[in-house]
Amino acid sequence: MNEEFEGDVPMSDPFLSLVTKLDDIAPFPNNDPLDFDMEHNWQEPGPSQQPDPSIPGNQHSPPQEYYDIDGQRDVSTLHSLLNHNNDDFFSMRFSPPNFDLGGGRGPSLAATQQLSGEGPASMLNPLQTSPPSGGYPPADAYRPLSLAQQLAAPAMTPHQAASLFVNTNGIDQKNFTHAMLSPPHHTSMTPQPYTEAMEHINGYMSPYDQAQGPSGPSYYSQHHQSPPPHHHHHHPMPKIHENPEQVASPSIEDAPETKPTHLVEPQSPKSPQNMKEELLRLLVNMSPSEVERLKNKKSGACSATNGPSRSKEKAAKIVIQETAEGDEDEDDEDSDSGETMSQGTTIIVRRPKTERRTAHNLIEKKYRCSINDRIQQLKVLLCGDEAKLSKSATLRRAIEHIEEVEHENQVLKHHVEQMRKTLQNNRLPYPEPIQYTEYSARSPVESSPSPPRNERKRSRMSTTTPMKNGTRDGSSKVTLFAMLLAVLIFNPIGLLAGSAIFSKAAAEAPIASPFEHGRVIDDPDGTSTRTLFWEGSIINMSYVWVFNILMIIYVVVKLLIHGDPVQDFMSVSWQTFVTTREKARAELNSGNLKDAQRKFCECLATLDRSLPSPGVDSVFSVGWECVRHLLNWLWIGRYIARRRRSTTKPVSVVCRSHAQTAVLYHEIHQLHLMGITGNFEDTYEPSALTGLFMSLCAVNLAEAAGASNDGLPRAVMAQIYISASIQCRLALPNLLAPFFSGYFLRRARRHVRRAPEHSVSHLLWIFHPATRKFMSDAKRLEHVLSSKQKQLRFGSFVEDEQLSPLARIRTTLKVYLLSKLVQELVGGDEIFTKNVERILNDNDRLDDEVDVVDVSRLLVTISTQCAAILTNEKDESAKFGTWISRNGDACCTWWTHVLTCGIYWRSNKNELARQHYSLIRNCPPKILTDNLGLAVGHALCARKICIDDRDSPKVSQYVCIHTKKSLESLRLFSTSSRASGVVSGIQEGTRRMAYEWIMNSLLDAWRSNLFASKPYWTQSFKGQSTFSTLYQEAYNHYAIINGTRGDCWRLFVYELTCRMLNGANPQATWSGVRRVRSTKMDAVRGRVSMRRSAQPDAFHLHTLVKLHTSMDL
């Protein structure tokens, strides 16, 4: 195709032809640097993948760029390389690594990372920035160093500043540009020991100025001027490489006054007594922590003689051990002798056993003296100097005194808090509370903290824990409610009153005598007794019910007013609650749902509340919340719950407390809906009764707080009602669930209508008929909300949101609506046969009518970003609505416009389809990384060109370009991993749509190159083979994904077209077209049945009939 058509589409804007006419698009023989190579890497989006056009450096030349940081080239350096045939680079058989990977655009690798010291990296010398103060050194003056010295030790003289970069030659290469410095020979990697004593210069070791005096020459000058006679002494050294070889370098004994330093024997003291005194003085001056570290150190001891006269006597030796570079031990600072060694060298002194025992006794004596002094000081403070107390009595007296002082402090703090509240209620200024630090924080570091022996007594003196308070309050409320139910059901007072009346009537009734027969006419006693009995029973029953009503009112008031704790916003417990709640919300935002639920439960315990235990407690708790909601519906419960508790807790404080508690219950209920219980056991299943209790608690407390400045915003109250509606749909039976779920949803709708539009725009999709139909299936809703489901792979269709129930419902609703659009576009539901996620059910598959405009607008509404910032005006610290914001979904919006445009094209509504072109062109970055998205986009561009740019001479060129790109993307997508379930059905539907657009575009562009006056089989044009090849590939792939069903007339029409483009017999093609046309007419008349997905493509059938008009005789 490249030989026939010139130009290409830019990958930085691949869908440019959607909003631009083809005549206005310039050819693209050379793409912009921001675009990709369309022939090789066009499927990889993003301009950052473009390779760097800079030419890499020559890796086989000596690393002059590495030595010369300024990048200068000097003739003398090249001359030095050419003249020294014995140079190390001359014998090098490999190229040194190029550390400047950034091409000069950033810091080099050698400047930012440490070298390992192995391989070719150990032969390269680090750069140096400070000039040396000596004379001009020779080029081959090389001294091997250890790896730690090469990387850390600065090469400097006492007269120069410190340098951060050191080379192993000790020469500043920046200032000596007239000499080429050679690295060490690559056959030797074993550094030799140094004979000079290392000096500390600004915290670093300098190995280059050891033999140089204040005014003397440098070491290298001495080495090359007058080397004295010497003898070789070999000493073991730690090796860097595994295979060491001999090094061809100057000997280390050439310098004068060389001494071996690897094993140092100290000079013996004048007498053993002096040595012992010095050791004891050293141990006494050491701190206890240093002594402990000294005792725990492990080292080997070596023996040596201390002179010819005392050869058999043991003496202390000092052994130098070199530690590894990366060993970071905090005890390396202190040696056994109290001296600090440098460069990881530790001096270990081994003393005789008698001396060590003496040191231990001194340390123990020091401890005992310190303890006795402190106990004596305590006794003087408590009882005076004359008192006689033992150590235990003194400590016991001190503990009792401390407890008494703490108790007094608690009482004083309580009084101060009450006075502060009184001043606050009277609106008088009051001082801020003083924060006192603990004694342990003010104590010195050296003193070891005493164990908290009075912790148990302090806990007994304090009040009970919030969890116990909440459990006790909850059980008391359940008990009161149980008593209320018992009074209403059994009426024990009425039974007692009835039994008393019956016994009284029985006592007053006359006793019939067996000897008396007959009756007395007009006896007044029976009538009067009966009248008095009825009058007495009515009066007595009224008394009983008045008493029952009074008891009910008492219980209700007790439960509503005194049963709900009101929080004090100035207390310490409230500050603890706020801190724990913020931590829980942070865990929730990070995705740690279980830990967030545990912290929310801790917040509930801090507010003196608790969740009911499974069983009878849950049943009575849910029953009481139902009764309370009935009272709230009658406005009796709201009026009683908002009453002022005390002077310090007015109505505003009560409403704010109820609002905060309602939001807390709502947040716990949100996680409970997703299957998070807050327990450590994963096998614990969430209870439906517990969910009902939390939802009803949130609703009742929200109604008690009210939708006011001191209460909750209407958007938050609407979301609380929505969660209660979802819980009723999940927990209640099928007969009761629709009624109660609809009841709470209507109350939420009422708050949404009264709230400002900008604050509730993120909740409007809940009340759409399609959403209500989606949420009517309890099993599907439970599966969507469950956290134990597998991670759904939605591909590039929607953004996956899993942090709240509404977010999960919104995500799956997007997939549900996209599947409805794909069903409408493809014309069948066979692609959704495998339904694993339960997003589609049987009723959804039977629905063939889809309101495209309604579904498209709903999808765009759901996918639009909306962040509602809701804050309580009077309480700035109590912020609501931070979890109700909604992020935008650009991918879902893009797919919605693409599918809607395809449906409009299928219905011949081209004007409505043009309204989506500009929105489709603004492709999200995630679509550019998805092969299916790119394929559909290019196929849509090709179809748009054939529909709207038919008169342009570039139609064939750009149709071939876009179809080729689309087929390449579809080929890559078929080999990549795909999703399953309903998402897989959406992918298959969009693939079919892309192949159909490709074949329609190719047929339309092929026909535009023909003359209508001649038969098509007698004509040929440039690029005809390109159309037939591309169409053949598209048809083959479409046949594979469509299956081998015999009743698919659509596939048969595509096969006829493919044969026609490849030069088949026109007579056979025409006979097949006549057969398809007759079958379609029979389906229209109702003689045969034909599925929507099997109906022939109208454009293909019409084009085939037009091309074979001359044969229709």
Curated annotation (Swiss-Prot):
Entry annotated with the keyword rRNA processing: no
UniProt GO BP: cellular response to zinc ion; determination of adult lifespan; fatty acid biosynthetic process; locomotion; long-chain fatty acid metabolic process; methyl-branched fatty acid biosynthetic process; positive regulation of gene expression; positive regulation of lipid storage
Top-level taxonomy: Eukaryota, Metazoa, Ecdysozoa, Nematoda, Chromadorea
Residue runs in coiled coils: 395-422
Basic residues compositional bias, start-end: 229-238
An annotated Gene Ontology molecular function: DNA-binding transcription factor activity
Observed phenotype of the null mutant: RNAi-mediated knockdown causes early larval arrest and a pale, skinny appearance; paleness due to absence of dark, lipid-laden fat granules from the intestine. Decrease in body size, delayed growth, fewer eggs laid and 5-6 days after being laid, many eggs hatch inside the body. Exposure to oleic or linoleic acid returns body size almost to normal and also increases number of eggs laid. In normoxic conditions, reduces total fat levels, but has no effect in anoxia. Reduces the increase in body width/length ratio caused by anoxia.
Extent of Acidic residues compositional bias: 324-337
Stretches for region Disordered: 24-68, 101-132, 206-274, 290-345, 437-472
Chain residue ranges for the region called Basic motif: 355-368
Function per UniProt: Transcription factor involved in maintaining normal fat levels. Regulates the expression of genes involved in lipid metabolism in response to nutrient availability, such as the fatty-acid desaturases fat-5, fat-6 and fat-7. In response to a high-glucose diet, promotes fatty acid synthesis, elongation and desaturation, acting in concert with transcription factor mxl-3. Plays a role in synthesis of monomethyl branched-chain fatty acids (mmBCFAs) as well as other very-long-chain fatty acids.
Keywords noted in UniProt: Coiled coil, DNA-binding, Endoplasmic reticulum, Membrane, Nucleus, Transcription, Transcription regulation, Transmembrane, Transmembrane helix, Ubl conjugation
Name of the protein described by the UniProt record: Sterol regulatory element binding protein sbp-1
Gene Ontology CC entries for this record: endoplasmic reticulum membrane; nucleus
PANTHER family associated with the record: LP12374P (PTHR46062:SF1), STEROL REGULATORY ELEMENT-BINDING PROTEIN (PTHR46062)
Residues spanning the signal sequence: none
InterPro entries according to UniProt: bHLH_dom (IPR011598), HLH_DNA-bd_sf (IPR036638)
Subcellular location: Nucleus
Tissue specificity comment: Broadly expressed, including many cells in the head. Expressed in the intestine.
Record PROSITE patterns: BHLH
Expression induction or repression: Expression increased by oxygen deprivation. Expression increased by glucose or fructose supplementation. Expression increased by simulated microgravity.
